[in-house]
């Protein structure tokens, strides 16, 4: 009986430590900073015209809070710009424009369900709302996803690739402030 209890405890501790290794902890904070590119497609298909890109002062930063093993909330700010003689939604620009956005997204981390043995990889889907400004101001519904590669065993330093589609609420009357995609490459630090 003692051997059975000892084996049961050993298995229990092993499973518990494995689960902790592969899941995000509650109450964790993360800070990320990096670059972004904007694909200003407007209402056009991203597969038919993926050529309208903005990459001028491409700074992005975010703070993320995990309230459970699989859910987090992220607040981000993004700066970018469009230079003269480039296009937004098929319209050539006659002057430079600055892009700024503030986004609040909920993230669902599901990578551990697909790759349970890869503790250095996290996959997420995100959805939320955003505020952005180019020539006018608009509000967007955000939908996207990404992947996070942890670069150390403690999972305190990583690299994230993330894409978010921003769908403008008032897009028929918005001019340049219309539907677009944001692509991010960020360094992530656990606080």
Locate the predicted segments by residue.
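Transmembrane beta-barrel domains of outer membrane proteins
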Residues: 62-64, 107-111, 146-150, 188-190
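Outer-membrane beta-barrel biogenesis signature
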Residues: 4-35, 118, 155
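Gram-negative (and chloroplast) outer-membrane scaffold detector with strong preference
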Residues: 65-141, 153-155
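Residues that define the transmembrane beta-barrel architecture of outer-membrane proteins
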Residues: 27-29, 53-59, 96-102, 121, ...
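Predominantly the C-terminal beta-signal and adjacent terminal strand-loop region
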Residues: 21, 42, 73-87, 149-191
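Transmembrane beta-barrel strands of outer-membrane/channel proteins
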Residues: 31-39, 75-79, 104, 125-131, ...
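Outer-membrane beta-barrel "beta-signal"
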Residues: 30-32, 103-109, 179-191
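Short glycine/proline- and aromatic-enriched beta-strand/turn motifs that initiate or cap beta-hairpins
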Residues: 20-65, 190
């Amino acid at each position: 009986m003692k051997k059975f209890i000892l084996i049961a405890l050993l298995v229990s501790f092993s499973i518990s430590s494995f689960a902790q290794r592969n899941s995000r902890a509650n109450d964790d904070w993360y800070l990320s900073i990096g670059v972004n590119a904007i694909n200003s497609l407007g209402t056009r298909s991203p597969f038919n015209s993926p050529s309208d890109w903005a990459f001028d002062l491409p700074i992005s930063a975010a703070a993320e809070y995990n309230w459970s093993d699989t859910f987090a909330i992220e607040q981000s700010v993004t700066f970018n710009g469009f230079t003269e003689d480039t296009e937004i939604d098929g319209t050539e620009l006659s002057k430079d424009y600055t892009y700024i956005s503030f986004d609040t997204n909920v993230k669902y981390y599901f990578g551990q369900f697909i790759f349970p043995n890869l503790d250095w990889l996290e996959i997420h889907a995100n959805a939320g709302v955003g505020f952005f400004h180019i020539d006018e101001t608009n509000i967007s519904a955000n939908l996207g996803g990404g992947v996070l590669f942890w670069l150390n065993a403690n999972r305190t330093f990583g690299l994230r690739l993330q894409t978010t589609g921003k769908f403008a609420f008032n897009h028929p009357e918005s001019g340049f402030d219309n539907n677009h995609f944001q692509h991010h490459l960020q360094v992530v630090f656990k606080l």
